[in-house]
Swiss-Prot record:
The gene is RLP36. One of its GO terms (cellular component) is plasma membrane. LRR repeats lie at residues 70-94, 95-118, 120-141, 143-165, 166-188, 189-213, 214-238, 239-261, 262-286, 288-310, 312-334, 335-359, 360-383, 384-406, 407-431, 433-454, 455-480, 481-505, 550-574, 575-598, 599-622, 624-647. Glycans are attached at N93, N141, N164, N199, N288, N373, N393, N528, N581, N597, N610, N629, N649. Residues 717-718 are cytoplasmic. SUPFAM superfamilies: L domain-like, RNI-like. This is Receptor-like protein 36. Coiled coil: none annotated. It is a single-pass type I membrane protein. Residues 27-695 are extracellular.
Amino acid sequence: MIRSLSYCFLTIYFFLSILPLPNTIACPTRLLCRSDQRDALLEVQKELHVPTTTWNKNVDCCSWDGVTCDAILGELVLSRCKLQGEIPSSIGNLSHLTYLDLSNNQLVGEVPASIGNLNQLESMRLWDNDLKGNIPTSFANLTKLSELYLFGNQFTGGDTVLANLTSLSIIDLSLNYFKSSISADLSGLHNLERFSVYNNSFSGPFPLSLLMIPSLVHIDLSQNHFEGPIDFRNTFSLSRLRVLYVGFNNLDGLIPESISKLVNLEYLDVSHNNFGGQVPRSISKVVNLTSVDLSYNKLEGQVPDFVWRSSKLDYVDLSYNSFNCFAKSVEVIDGASLTMLNLGSNSVDGPFPKWICKVKDLYALDLSNNHFNGSIPQCLKYSTYFHTLNLRNNSLSGVLPNLFIKDSQLRSLDVSSNNLVGKLPKSLINCERIEFLNVKGNKIMDTFPFWLGSLPYLKVLMLGSNAFYGPVYNPSAYLGFPSIRIIDISNNNFVGSLPQDYFANWLEMSLVWSGSDIPQFKYMGNVNFSTYDSIDLVYKGVETDFDRIFEGFNAIDFSGNRFSGHIPGSIGLLSELRLLNLSGNAFTGNIPPSLANITNLESLDLSRNNLSGEIPISLGKLSFLSNTNFSYNHLEGLIPQSTQFATQNCSSFLGNLGLYGFREICGESHHVPVPTTSQQPEEPLSESEDQLLNWIAAAIAFGPGMFCGLVIGHIFTS
């Protein structure tokens, strides 16, 4: 019976010989620990700091915590035990081991050559450590090895030794630093089922010998530097292959017609290569395909018809190619199971493809960055499972129709950069789960949609560059937007003033991420379908496309409208705001000192308003503030002399005649305005200074008077 340790998963089975007893003794025998196995265990414990206190050489090791004596098995499992240091050479003394698992530890250095003594070993798992160097040549002795997991280390070579281990069924060398080409003939690995080397630096031609192994089920060569064409003509034996991943390489040429020989293929990824020409019609014969990724290549011509003629196909990504049209007649088969279609960033033109309405289970559709024209069809309302709809940057016209039925599943809608007119459809209120709404860059004429404020999950609202008009504050309307993180209403015709508490309810922008909640490398969108939300904003003075939006990014852009009155002091509550652009309005009054509370602010643009007073010195303490623009206001006083302000562009302060302190920012050669008397602070004079000034004034007056008197007297006497 295995006794589990409280601080790590530790199981050890050893092949231990049992002392022979006379045949006349009928009572059961007790398994005894062999001394050489016990000593080898103690050596491993000493060098790897195995976390157990019950291993005592004076006690039979069969009773140690985590040790079970078995007459046929020999297993050592020390996974996730926080082991440190190098694998000791003494591990080679455990000669009867059949299973070795040292994964998920902090092991360093090279694998000792003595590991080749474990000639009974069938499974080796060393993944997720910091092991480096070459795979030892002594691995050639591991003729019974069936499973080899070395992924997540720093190995650089020695992989050729594996070509002779004919018992191998699994080889996983992923996430290492292997650099060579796979030149060894692997066709002799007739038991191999899984071969994975993704995220290394392997180079050279595609290893065709892999395709001669009839037992292969899974091949992953992605994220390497393989180059040249790929051909399946001699792969008559690959009838079992289900997974082929070769994305993120330098493969080129045509996708071969011989791909039809992979009759059981289910997952195909050739993305991020240099394949050109048309997709072969023969791919439609691979009837078991469920996921196809051909994105980021140079494919052209007609969109392949297997997209809508397969009953098993679930995921298709054809984005970032040069496809330009659909077939003249598209007939969607009954039972089409497509849930995700990405045709973004191609050159497809013509009207919106209405056949898409017949794909009832469609979950995510991306037709962005093409040349589609005409109106958005009403029939899309019957696609009840829509989660993501991206029609960005086309030439679509007409109104945005009322597509959104009650209990809609829609999470993301992007129709930006088209020619849509009319008003926002009120049916959007049915999209209670929507997080992302982008209608920027159209010709929509409507008032501010206060009614969207009740949507509980709306994070991004992009209304910029349309013809919206009127106030954005209504005391009788609930402003809401409890989850808003990014709002862009720039370049419209909004007017009026904002109350001081206008931003008080935008709680998500004041949320401070802490500990494990920090969304590192997490982006807005659907990760499962690789459909990420994207926006364009003026960021640090430059029009910037955000292909992916970091979850922690918060922005407000109210620029290019006709807002008046004071900037609300409640803006200072939004401590996690990264971008604030209020330029091109008619705001008056002082810059609110509460801006200094926005500790993560990176970009601040208050230019082209009617602001007055001084730039708050406290803004100089914002350590992330890398871009500011205060130009063309009525500001005065000393520019804050902090490091953050000293690195700003000189043009950020132009058009403010009352500002001074430019020398540190603009250099000696720049004209430095001299503060006028009104700009200098007045100090009360002491009594002695006051008397002195009186005497100076009297003397100044007395001199000219005396001179004039002498001249006049001389005239009269003469």
